[in-house]
Structure formats: structure tokens, C-alpha cells
């Protein structure tokens, strides 16, 4: 595989004093230059840069991306907070910034601290070079000349099978010396160290799971509704759990949404097409089936490059499919809902299950590598004071979602992706559920079922993630025959 610098950098950014050679290249490719305080930013449309001020009209930082305020909607231009910045930075950021949903990066520029924070799931991923003290959306913006190839860790890339379906966990990237910031950690711009800022104490278990499901439903619906007030919105509709929750939360304004389903020649896609079409017809939803479009090799090479050579799998060649929606402003998906599905738990796990770097790496389902084990060990040292079930949830959120799910944030730049299950309020709601509400059984769980029931109970009359008849008996066998490596990965997760 020959590495190339991306031709198109739409939706990307760089923060800090870039080397002159890098800055000149990015400006030539269309970057916009702006300083907030004394910190330089380079951004490529449609990436939005919003100046943040406190109640005293003092500039305290900037937001990148598409943040959504629960009261005023999509944030643009300038964001004015209703309180002054105080000395308790951690509490201030948690209350004022993590009240936002949407997809964003927050750069704090205060006298007492200069830091970078991701949103609750790191849906706008970023990487950084501690030596050059620069931060960017992907690695290529931090490199010059032959460094793209010379600093590429090809051995680790191949060992982790990134091209097929692997990824770099624990803050690793495909390039030596460049690290990825994980969700729930901030980057200190003074010394380029990272520190956990959430959670700082265990999330308490809710005494009323149904009421907490209502909170989750409201949070999802509020975010989607605000998007409809700001632009045109396409929403994924599948046979899955998360898109059903999004639809249930959007019942009152579903007529303002355009629902889409990918019509691909796969077993999972056939379930999606059948159930999505039935739901749309029954409830009068605007719905379209979009064809699976394959990239040629040149487009696949460009896509790998735009993502910093940190992501692989079928999407390398399937990514042009989303181009069917480029006339829309936003695409709403269901990523983040897995946090409420006990994804890394095993049936015999308890809050006291012994965990170490080796067992966490096995849960990730990837080959055992010294680099990965060391990275996970460092992460585990920063994740003390939580029971084992919470630690496994944080591993999924931080090591997988932040390093895999959103390492691909910049491959497709129109429309803007927003995942309304991602917010601090939503994640607190999910993590506060009793274990029995989160464990999956028959491809769903009580939290999902109750959330859908509260919003639109008739949607539960259509099966979740299955046909609901004899065809389900053969689905796993068919998948195992077509993709045997997935069986091995599942075994590593279960018994590794």
C-alpha cells in the first residue's frame, strides 16, 4: 500500500503553530486561518469554528464542529455562556460544555488552563504530535514530505489487520510519535499530557429505570428536533435497536425527516430493507432506499488517507454510498447507543471480575500485541476506582468507540454526521441502568424496549434485528461461512 497525502481535506482542522511547510500546503488546499486568543486554527469547510465567551464577555475558548444547545439549538457564530469562568475548571467545563449534544471539540483558553476536550464519545476525533505541539483531525495534517511513509508503523498496521477490520486502540495511531486523544480525557496544551476528566466517581444506579429511559428518549428527540430547525435531515432506518429508539424519540416531528436505508446484497441489509420499508409504509414516513455504491481503487486510497490510515474494513470501498445524501445538511445515525448494551460484558462477569491489560485486550477482539497491551495498561492505570462492569463500559467507549468508531470521522464530509444518542446526559442515563436492563437477550435489552415503548410503542410490533421467522435460523451459519474471521474474533472476545 502506497501512502498518499489527501487531495481533499473538507471538514478537517489543525490547531497550533504548524511547520511552515505544512501550513503552506494546507493553505494552498483551501484552509481558513484564524486565531482565537493567541492560538492559531486552520479549518476546512464545512468545519465550523465558534468563539466561546463567558458571561463577562471574555473569550475563554472555541468550539469546533456542530454543538447543539438543549435550549437554543445548533450553535453557530458565537457561543455565550450565562456564567463567568471560575477557578474550578473541571466543574465549569462539565456543567457548561458537557450540557451540549451534537458533535464537537472544545478548546479551553483560560489564564489558569489551556486544554482540549472531545464530546462525550469523541465523535470529532483528533490526533496530536507532542514533539511539534500541534493537534489535528488526522495524521496527514501533522506530517510533511516523506514523513507520511517514513513514520508509518506498517508492521503494527498489518499485525492488527487494520485493512480488514482492525484499529489502533489506547491512543495509538498508524504513525510513530502521533497519538490519538481518547474520549473522557483532555489534552493539556502546556505539556501535551492527557488526563481523565470523566467519570471521576462511579455513576450511581438509577432507582427508576423507566424514568431514566424517558430522560434518554427526551435527550435523543431534543437533539434531532433542533437539527430539523437548522437544516434538512436524513435519518438512518434499519432493523436495529438504535435507529428504532431515534424514530421513537422523533415521533412528534417524523414528518420533517427523510429516512434512508442502504439496499445492499447482504443478509443484514435485507432485514433492514424489509423492516424499514414496512415501518415507513405503516406510519407514512418519507423513506428512500439508496444503493450500495463501490469506490474504485483510487477513491479507496484517498479515503484511507483522509482518515489518517487508522481505519479499514468494508467501508473503504462502500463509502461513496453516502454521496446520495450530499444535498442534505445532516445525517443522523445511531452510534453511541452501544454504551447501553453491555457490549464487552461476558455472562459470568460481576462487578468484582478481575481485569488486567491482557483481558481488556482480549475483549477488544484483536491479536495480542506488545504495543497494544502497553497502551491498554496505561489506560487501565488511569481508570482506577471503578467496578469491573463500569471499567468494561469505559473500555468500549474510550478504547473502541473513540479509537475505532470515530477514527473515521473525516472520511465522508457531507452531510454532517450527528449521532443523537451521544451526550453526557444520555451516557449517564445508560450507565446508571441496572445490569439486567442492559444485558442483551434476543438481540435487544429492557432499556431499549422501554425507551421505544415510551416514545412510540407500535414500533415494537416490528422485530428488532431479525426477521422474526424461520429465516433467522440460518443467519449466523451464513455469516460464519462468508466471514470466518468474525467467528475467530468473537471467540477471542469470549474466551481470550
Predicted regions mapped to residue ranges:
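Short alpha-helical scaffolding segments that buttress acidic/His motifs in well-ordered protein cores
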Residues: 159-163, 393-400, 430
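Acidic, carboxylate-rich catalytic segments that either coordinate divalent cations
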Residues: 487-496
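Active-site/acyl-donor-binding loops of N-acyltransferases
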Residues: 186, 472-473
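Charge-dense polyanion-binding interfaces
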Residues: 144, 149-152, 161-163, 441-469
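Structural motif
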Residues: 91, 95-97, 150-155, 383-394, ...
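Cysteine-centered catalytic environments shared across enzyme families
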Residues: 1-235, 241, 245-291
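Core structural elements
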Residues: 186, 395-406
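ATP-dependent adenylate-handling active sites, centered on carboxylate activation for C-N bond formation
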Residues: 113, 191, 202-389, 404-461, ...
Amino acid at each position: 500500500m502506497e501512502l498518499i497525502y489527501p487531495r481533499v481535506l473538507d471538514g478537517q482542522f489543525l490547531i497550533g503553530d504548524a511547520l511552515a511547510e505544512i501550513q503552506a500546503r494546507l493553505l494552498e488546499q483551501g484552509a481558513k486561518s484564524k486565531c482565537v486568543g493567541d492560538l492559531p486554527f486552520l479549518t476546512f469547510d464545512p468545519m465550523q469554528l465558534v468563539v466561546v465567551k463567558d458571561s463577562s464577555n471574555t473569550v475563554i475558548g472555541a468550539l469546533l464542529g456542530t454543538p447543539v444547545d438543549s435550549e437554543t439549538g445548533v450553535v453557530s457564530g458565537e457561543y455565550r455562556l450565562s456564567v463567568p469562568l471560575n477557578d474550578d475548571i473541571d466543574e465549569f467545563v462539565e456543567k457548561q460544555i458537557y450540557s451540549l449534544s451534537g458533535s464537537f471539540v472544545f478548546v479551553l483558553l483560560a489564564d489558569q488552563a489551556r486544554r482540549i476536550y472531545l464530546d462525550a464519545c469523541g465523535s470529532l476525533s483528533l490526533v496530536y504530535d507532542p514533539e511539534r505541539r500541534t493537534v489535528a483531525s488526522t495524521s496527514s495534517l501533522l506530517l510533511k514530505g516523506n514523513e507520511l511513509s517514513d513514520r508509518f508503523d506498517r508492521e503494527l498496521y498489518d499485525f492488527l489487520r487494520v485493512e480488514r477490520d482492525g484499529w489502533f486502540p489506547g491512543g495509538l495511531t498508524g504513525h510513530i510519535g502521533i497519538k490519538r486523544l481518547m474520549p473522557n480525557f483532555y489534552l493539556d496544551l502546556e505539556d501535551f499530557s492527557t488526563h481523565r476528566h470523566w467519570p471521576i466517581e462511579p455513576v450511581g444506579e438509577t432507582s427508576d429505570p423507566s424514568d431514566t429511559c424517558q430522560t434518554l428518549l427526551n435527550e435523543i428527540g431534543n437533539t434531532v428536533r433542533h437539527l430539523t430547525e437548522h437544516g434538512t435531515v436524513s435519518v438512518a432506518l434499519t432493523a436495529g435497536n438504535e435507529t428504532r429508539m431515534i424514530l421513537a424519540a422523533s415521533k412528534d416531528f417524523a414528518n420533517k425527516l427523510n429516512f434512508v436505508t442502504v439496499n445492499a446484497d447482504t443478509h443484514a441489509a435485507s432485514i433492514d430493507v424489509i423492516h424499514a420499508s414496512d415501518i415507513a409504509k405503516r406510519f407514512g414516513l418519507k423513506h428512500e432506499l439508496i444503493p450500495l455504491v463501490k469506490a474504485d481503487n483510487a477513491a479507496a486510497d484517498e479515503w484511507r488517507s483522509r482518515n489518517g490510515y487508522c481505519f479499514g474494513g468494508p467501508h473503504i470501498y462502500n463509502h461513496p454510498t453516502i454521496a446520495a445524501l450530499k444535498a442534505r445538511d445532516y445525517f443522523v445515525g445511531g452510534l453511541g447507543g452501544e454504551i447501553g448494551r453491555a457490549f464487552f460484558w461476558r455472562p459470568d462477569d460481576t462487578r468484582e471480575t478481575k481485569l488486567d491489560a491482557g483481558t481488556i485486550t482480549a475483549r477488544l477482539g484483536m491479536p495480542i500485541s506488545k504495543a497494544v497491551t502497553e497502551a491498554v495498561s496505561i489506560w487501565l492505570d488511569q481508570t482506577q476506582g471503578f467496578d469491573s462492569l463500569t471499567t468494561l463500559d469505559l473500555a468500549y467507549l474510550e478504547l473502541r468507540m473513540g479509537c475505532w468508531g470515530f477514527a473515521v470521522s473525516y472520511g465522508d464530509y457531507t452531510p454532517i454526521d450527528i449521532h443523537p444518542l451521544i451526550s453526557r446526559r444520555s451516557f449517564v442515563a445508560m450507565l446508571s441502568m441496572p445490569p439486567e436492563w442492559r444485558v442483551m437477550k434476543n438481540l435487544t435489552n429492557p432499556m431499549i424496549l422501554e425507551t421505544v415503548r415510551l416514545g412510540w410503542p407500535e414500533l415494537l410490533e416490528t422485530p428488532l434485528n431479525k426477521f422474526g421467522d424461520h429465516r433467522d435460523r440460518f443467519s449466523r451459519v451464513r455469516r460464519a461461512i462468508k466471514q470466518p474471521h468474525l467467528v475467530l474474533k468473537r471467540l477471542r472476545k469470549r474466551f481470550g
